[in-house]
Each structure stands twice: as structure tokens, then as C-alpha cells.
Amino acid sequence: MPSIQLCLFASTPEMAELNFLVKVLTGTPEELARRAVAWGYDGIEFMPDPERVPEPGELEKALKAAGAVMPVVNTGRMAPQGMALLHEEAATRRRSMEAFKRMVDFAGNFGARVGLGVARGPGIPGAGPEEMERMADQVFRELAEYAEKARAVIMLEPADPGVTSYINTVDEAMAWVERVGSPAFGVMLDTYQLAEAEPSIEHGIRAARGRANHIHLYDPSRWPPGVLPDKDRLDWTHLARVLREERFSGSGSVVLAPEGDAEQAARKAAEFLRRLLAG
């Protein structure tokens, strides 16, 4: 398998107050970059505050000093901060589009990709398929056009029904990628979604048809891979084999352990994944 950049989910200190779905590394840009490399990773998947996206200079300096990378900007903080790209209220949609575009601009400074997952929202109560489709078409096309100009790439992330009612499978995400037809609008994978929303993990990975170049790597238990092997629900060896067959390349991001020694677990996960993906 081609080399994959391993990253840690990372954000600023106040992230800890948001009760996010998974636990992430928090700290200053310098702390994030330094710890990620020290713990065995190539860099970070950064989750900025969508309402106060930082200037890129400080993070750029920190990454360079640590020898780290930041290939992906995660927009997941939009959800707990009350934003949704697909929302019944026009004011919320405008606020959300503005926030997402700020993160696209931020990513463009690094030549990075931008995940579009829970940022689209849980779905609109009472909205029919045609209404959701019209709204999504407008939003996705506008964002793709914006990303092209910003020299960034948006990655549509399917999510399980517990997170959103709209775009749950890789097949659905790929239909949108084909429909939008922009080089700045692609797809990404997530192992939790693959386990919860696909006919099989293999089906989900292959449905991306080699177009995905980023994957979230964690067990449905929300633990990082290889830390609690007796409790893992995923067959990581099988997953790695399918990724290899699909010639997956790019980057993969890992969460922190939800409890216990975060550093020890992160180091163990990095060692496990490097052995697994080198196979």
C-alpha cells in the first residue's frame, strides 16, 4: 500500500467543553504539532472554531518547527456550535455557509482538504427528498466553486443515521460527487460509518471507486485501533487488505482514547496502524 500520512484529530483547548462525538488532542498550535509527532504521527487533522477560524501563520510555523503536516481541516465543530449547511432557517444556512467558507480559505493556505460530514446537519424535520435534494445541490455546488478558487478540496463524508438522515452511504456520497462534477468536490471514508451504515465494510470502501484519499480510523466503540484488541468490533486486518486492494493512498486520522492514558493509547495505535498498513 502507498504511504499513508497518519494524523491525530486535534483542536484548540475549548474543544473539550463541546462534548464532541470523539475525544481529540487539544492545545496550542505548537503543542498540537509537537505532541502529534512525538506520539508517532505525521501530523494533525485540525478542527478550528468555525466562528473564529485562526490566521494560518501560527499553525504554519508550528507545523514547520515540529516537522508535522496538516492535510485535512475537519469542520465537525459546526454541529455542536449550532450550525448546519442544510437547515430549515435561512439565517442558519447563511451563517453556516460563511463559517464553512472561512475554513475552506484556511485549508487553501496549506493545500489541504476539508471534510464535509456532520456540518451538513442532522436533516430537516418534515422535509421531503426533493426539498433536501434542491437545497443540497445549491449548497454543494456553491461550496465546490468556492473551493476551486481557494485551491482546496472538499470531501463529502457519509455518516451513519445516528448523526444525520441525509447521505448515509458511500454510494449516496459518490452520486453527489458525480453530480457536482468538480475537481474540488470528492469523497472520504470513516470506519464508524462503514461499520454502521454499509452492507459491509468492503462494500463501502469499494463504493468509493478509488476516489477517497482520506479515512477516519477508529473502532465503533470510539477507541483508536489496536488499543483494546479484544474489544475491537472491526476486523482491522480485513479492512487494511481491502484498502490495499483499492490502492488507497493519502491520509488517515485517529481519535484519542475516551479514557485512560491518552498518550500511551495514541502511541500504541500509531504503532499498530503502521504495521498494519505496511503489510
Q: Language-model features: where?
A:
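Catalytic-core regions built around general acid/base machinery
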Residues: E58-G67, V139-Y146, G204-A207, H238-V242
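N-terminal pre-domain/capping segments
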Residues: M1-G108, R141, S182, G210, ...
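Histidine-acidic metal/acid-base catalytic patches
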Residues: M1-G40, I167-L189, A195-G279
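Active-site acidic/histidine proton-transfer and metal-coordination neighborhood
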Residues: V22-T26, L85-G186, E196
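Active-site-proximal loop/turn and secondary-structure-junction residues that shape catalytic pockets
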Residues: A10-E14, P48-P50, G76-A79, R120-P122, ...
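Conserved beta-strand positions in the central sheet of alpha/beta enzyme cores
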Residues: E45, V72-N74, G115-L116, M155, ...
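Short Asp/Glu-rich motifs
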Residues: E55-P56, G82-M83, G126-A127, Y166, ...
